[in-house]
């Protein structure tokens, strides 16, 4: 794999985002590798737990804006739609996989990556972590199941406010709202993880598989209908002038001038 690192440590599969030169921005190849790694971990009977973390100063900015700029300039709507489909599938996979999925967040996590953190069963954050629904900044709406996941985690009103303002949610506030399991200093993050794994290793993997299925069936029965709506909206938004303006403005380091078209 070129864009992530996949390794095994006893019963733990570790997926590390490894594009720090672009702040671990998601593009099609990396998304496909994440799905491949998740499938490897899911199908390996020796793996009982999955950890997703990242190299670099930030966890991820979400979508790769350099790639978005290329797609906008070339009017490449299919690739933009493909990314939206892939990140949605990753969140869906995290929720469906019959093993506990942990995510370690240090620094900013934005866009689709922030929503994958919500999808994880346990999010461990450093005190420097910030969770950002950055989509409105480029004229989009949340993807990777964002509103579906957030509204069920923190309530409809808070989910809407985060999505509409794009405000950064601190690690402490995320902990208070229940989005984060534990917050620690960066140098203590690994210890926090090991404490959690020690606790999780006390129970049967069959229990975790059953619990995840029960949680899913009780709260996410309408996912497919939601995912279809989300993808169609994202495809439509990706064709707007405001989206093109948002991406170009970000690339040019200026404030976007949205016109509602």
From Swiss-Prot:
Single GO MF descriptor: trans-2-decenoyl-acyl-carrier-protein isomerase activity
Keyword terms of this UniProt record: Fatty acid metabolism, Isomerase, Lipid metabolism
Highest taxon in the source lineage: Bacteria
Q: Which InterPro entries match?
A: ClpP/crotonase-like_dom_sf (IPR029045), Enoyl-CoA_hydra/iso (IPR001753), Enoyl-CoA_hydra_C (IPR014748), Enoyl-CoA_Hydratase/Isomerase (IPR051683)
Protein's pathway: Lipid metabolism; fatty acid biosynthesis
Any Pfam family matching the protein: ECH_1
Reactions it catalyzes:
(2E)-decenoyl-[ACP] = (3Z)-decenoyl-[ACP]
- EC number of the protein: 5.3.3.14
Q: Name one GO biological process term.
A: fatty acid beta-oxidation
Subunit-structure text:
Homotetramer.
Q: Which family is it part of?
A: Belongs to the enoyl-CoA hydratase/isomerase family.
Q: What does this protein do?
A: Catalyzes the isomerization of trans-2-decenoyl-ACP to cis-3-decenoyl-ACP. Most active with 10-carbon enoyl-ACP. Can also use 12-carbon enoyl-ACP as substrate, but not 14- and 16-carbon enoyl-ACP.
- What protein is this chain from? Trans-2-decenoyl-[acyl-carrier-protein] isomerase
Organism of origin is Streptococcus pneumoniae (strain ATCC BAA-255 / R6)
Phylogenetic placement of the source organism: Bacteria, Bacillati, Bacillota, Bacilli, Lactobacillales
Gene that specifies this protein: fabM
